[in-house]
Structure formats: structure tokens, C-alpha cells
């Protein structure tokens, strides 16, 4: 008899529908452990159970910090609205758009921030934040796609960190789970908005 599959934070179909499980055509050595299979088109598909497990782990970890001491970063445009939506509800600091050098390391800067933990949307796009956090010993939680490096990342959340639906769902889940753990929401209570309302507008090139 096979082991019973544990209940996930959201239905498995939602991870597929939002594209959270779909990686790139490149996979770094570390990220292989999160891969479920390679699709016929050559794209790596992530294991939704491992994504779900890491999201739960990240929410538990982040809920131990005072909200105002959590900085959430997104240079990537499709991550900016979800980050702001999360920070409005949790009470953390949103840093979106270009990251000014010295944000975490130069107290003389007007935009200086002194968080206890940093969440980044993409280790490559948000590299400035990752490097600075590492320099001053701030732990980094990151959404990591199959082609990303995990250098200076302390907690990896495997996920499609490019898609607007994917980023909306990920930040919606993190928001809900943090608020549940902090007692703001009941254990079975949802947010007052759907994950689609976390979604950025589509950008046409």
C-alpha cells in the first residue's frame, strides 16, 4: 500500500494552472533534486510536492520575524505587484524596481534598510540584494528557478520565478501562511482576495 500523500497548501492542479511547476530548459546541479521530469519540449518540470514543502517551510521561518524586519525584493516587473500586495498585508518592507547599491550596507543612505531577513524573487535579477545581505549576515530566502545559482541563498523555494501567474500564487500562499501562523487568520481561513488579484498586468513588448 502506497504512503498517503499529505495535504498541500493549495490543490496540486493550481500549481500547474499558475505555471509554478514549469522551469526552464537549463537545470543547475543543485536544482535537480526538485525536478519531477523533463518535458518533451526540453523544459524541466518541478515537483509540486517539493515546491509546496518549501513554501510551508519558508512561511514558518518568516513568521518567526517581526514583520517590519522582513524585506521582500523584486526587480522583475511581474514580481513587483505580488511583493507589494504581500507586504501591505503582512507589514513587511517592499523593495521593488532597481535596488540602490548600499540599501543593506550603507547606513548613510536615505533608502537604507536594516532587515533581519530578505526574500528575493529571482537570485539573478535581485543579485545586488543577495550580495549585500550576505555581506552583513542577513539570511536570504529566494524563489529559485531551475537555471538559477543558489550562491548566498539560505532557503530555496523551487519555482517558476518569471511568470506573472506563478509569482502571484507564490506570494499569495506565503502571505496567507504567514498570517495563519501569526494568528491573524484562522488555520483554515483564506485571504480576503484571490491569488489573481496579486497578479501584475501583462506587459506587451
UniProtKB/Swiss-Prot annotation:
Keywords: Ribonucleoprotein, Ribosomal protein. It comes from the Archaea. SUPFAM superfamilies: Ribosomal protein S2. InterPro entries: Ribosomal_uS2, Ribosomal_uS2_arc, Ribosomal_uS2_CS, Ribosomal_uS2_euk/arc, Ribosomal_uS2_flav_dom_sf. GO terms for molecular function: structural constituent of ribosome. One of its GO terms (cellular component) is small ribosomal subunit. The keyword Ribosomal protein applies. One of its GO terms (biological process) is translation. Transmembrane segments: none annotated. NCBIfam families: uS2_euk_arch. Belongs to the universal ribosomal protein uS2 family. This is Small ribosomal subunit protein uS2.
